[in-house]
Amino acid sequence: MGSLASERKVVGWAARDATGHLSPYSYTLRNTGPEDVVVKVLYCGICHTDIHQAKNHLGASKYPMVPGHEVVGEVVEVGPEVAKYGVGDVVGVGVIVGCCRECSPCKANVEQYCNKKIWSYNDVYTDGRPTQGGFASTMVVDQKFVVKIPAGLAPEQAAPLLCAGVTVYSPLKHFGLTNPGLRGGILGLGGVGHMGVKVAKAMGHHVTVISSSSKKRAEAMDHLGADAYLVSSDAAAMAAAADSLDYIIDTVPVHHPLEPYLALLKLDGKLVLLGVIGEPLSFVSPMVMLGRKAITGSFIGSIDETAEVLQFCVDKGLTSQIEVVKMGYVNEALERLERNDVRYRFVVDVAGSNVEAEAAAADAASN
């Protein structure tokens, strides 16, 4: 079991201000408790939300900030009351590391909707210390917010499933959209969208990818297995596809009109918003009234759903398409992600990186 150190110094890569530039940062992990798991970080995926947070797009960033919420690591120590995990287990940590455990969402095991949830970074833990994420060598996490990575799933492949994977799986399950034969749309083909295509296809759905241009058509259909591809600026094609979809999973993280996509939905169709957008979205009410259509949202998934989607991907043979990078490349990776220059998810090889040495190399390369 090992004796848990009350405090320990670690090095992560942190943003110091709204430029979002990351550099090495030494800090002390929070005190460990009886139900805590100490995780040596192996890999951490890069999510578009990491950009929003590092650059203070949402207006609530606190610095220094170590991002990263798609964390896969190895358990190196456990508290005396930890029963679910042992040293050597490969585990995952996602967006949430704390909740009140008393509210209705917590009692319903959908703790991601708890109003007192604690984010894995850019938040304050119950002891008053800031939480820091997975772009670091080590994390301390309550066992409730840790999931086992099942056998048959490579750790680097598992990382994006802890956010992108469960983010598309959860609404499909919750809204009863898992039956084979449904016709679904995936709006946006980034890290979340590409997993949306894969998960929906594995459920037996007819999947249409909707994008602003035709440049991803071959990838969507030939590589990811989509059944159809719609260019949203092609008025004739959009009109021909009206009233054809049971649901649309909207993964676009920037402001965009909703009405063109509402027109694609059948009677009782659902438009599920997943992208984090800081500006109001608008539509005219008849677009939903005349087809009894619903605009709704979903936020990541519960710990139980995270475990489910990991096993679902193992059972269905699904993997995320990733580009593995070292920590010294993380700033370039964030810049490339911001301009959509990745297919489809960056994953940082944290354990294989020397954060201090790679920082010096990155600084030398920029001079």
Swiss-Prot record:
Q: What happens when the gene is disrupted?
A: Reduced lignin content, and modified lignin of reddish-brown color.
CDD domains assigned: CAD1
Q: MF terms per GO, please? A: cinnamyl-alcohol dehydrogenase activity; coniferyl-alcohol dehydrogenase activity; zinc ion binding
Enzyme nomenclature, EC number: 1.1.1.195
Residues involved in Zn(2+) 2 binding: C100, C103, C106, C114
Q: Which residues bind NADP(+)?
A: 49, 167, 188-193, 211-216, 251, 275, 298-300
Q: Which residues cross the membrane?
A: none
Tell me how the cofactor is bound.
Answer: Binds 2 Zn(2+) ions per subunit.
Which controlled-vocabulary keywords does the entry list? Lignin biosynthesis, Metal-binding, NADP, Oxidoreductase, Zinc
Keyword Metal-binding applies: yes
Q: Which reaction does it catalyse?
A: (E)-cinnamyl alcohol + NADP(+) = (E)-cinnamaldehyde + NADPH + H(+); (E)-coniferol + NADP(+) = (E)-coniferaldehyde + NADPH + H(+); (E)-sinapyl alcohol + NADP(+) = (E)-sinapaldehyde + NADPH + H(+); (E)-4-coumaroyl alcohol + NADP(+) = (E)-4-coumaraldehyde + NADPH + H(+)
What is one process in the GO biological process aspect for this record?
Answer: lignin biosynthetic process
Q: Please report which protein family the annotation says this sequence is part of.
A: Belongs to the zinc-containing alcohol dehydrogenase family.
Name of the molecule in the record = Probable cinnamyl alcohol dehydrogenase
**High-level lineage:** Eukaryota, Viridiplantae, Streptophyta, Embryophyta, Tracheophyta
Give the encoding gene's name: CAD
